[in-house]
């Protein structure tokens, strides 16, 4: 089994990475492979609604999004992490998630997901509210802990001083490992995820 962790921070080894590493550490301890994918510092343009991804060949703009889609095909679960920028996910992470969802949502469906964010001080809850919208759109079981998944600090050393936040990250890793094993056991017993029909599309204004 493998979990793909997305680092939406422009700092490759910063606070968000520290939080994701705590999650990955617990997954690794349970015998689950992990990979942290950095969205990076190059600008990630937003989705323009062109519909080109409907052909099933990824996003027409390519880049880190299509690289993530390829990795998503073989991943069993995901963790989406971001720093807090003006009480929301980073700009690159927002564009990345929008395009990943539109062009690669079929590879996210029914796979467990966790979210987390890192901030110096505030804006965490609104950021988590933003991130949770993506797994809720694709039938993804949401992995939680004993508190909202956030850490605080201006640098990795300070994040590690946030004992409660770090403990919650570790809970996410352990709980995700448990859920993945449950899903694996279910498959071995012949239990598959439901095949839901395509939902009807209705507009608020006819």
Q: What kind of region is each of these model predictions?
A:
Residues 2-30:
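N-terminal beta1-alpha1 ligand-phosphate binding loop
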Residues 25-32, 77, 101-105, 136-140, ...:
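Generic secondary-structure signature for well-ordered alpha-helical cores
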Residues 32-42:
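A short beta-strand-loop structural module common to alpha/beta enzyme folds
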Residues 42-72, 200-206:
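Cysteine-cluster motifs in flexible loop/terminal segments that predominantly coordinate metals
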Residues 141-206:
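Glycine-rich phosphate/pyrophosphate-binding loop and the adjoining helix
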């Amino acid at each position: 089994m493998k979990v793909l962790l997305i680092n939406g921070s422009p700092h490759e080894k910063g606070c968000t990475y520290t939080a994701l590493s705590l999650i990955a550490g617990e997954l690794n301890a349970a015998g689950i492979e992990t990979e942290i994918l950095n969205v990076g510092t190059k600008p990630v343009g937003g989705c323009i609604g062109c519909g080109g991804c409907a052909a099933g060949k990824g996003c027409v703009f390519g880049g880190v999004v299509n690289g993530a889609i390829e990795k998503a095909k073989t991943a069993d679960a995901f963790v989406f992490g971001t720093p807090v920028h003006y009480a929301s996910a980073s700009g690159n992470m927002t564009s990345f998630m929008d395009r990943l969802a539109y062009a690669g949502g079929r590879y996210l469906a029914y796979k467990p997901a966790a979210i987390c964010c890192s901030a110096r001080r505030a804006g965490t809850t609104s950021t988590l509210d933003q991130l949770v919208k993506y797994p809720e759109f694709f039938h993804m079981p949401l992995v939680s802990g004993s508190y909202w998944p956030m850490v605080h600090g201006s640098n990795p050393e300070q994040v590690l001083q946030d004992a409660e936040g770090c403990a919650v990250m570790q809970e996410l890793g352990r709980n995700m490992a448990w859920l993945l094993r449950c899903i694996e056991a279910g498959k071995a017993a012949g239990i598959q995820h439901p095949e839901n029909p395509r939902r009807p599309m209705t507009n608020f204004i006819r």
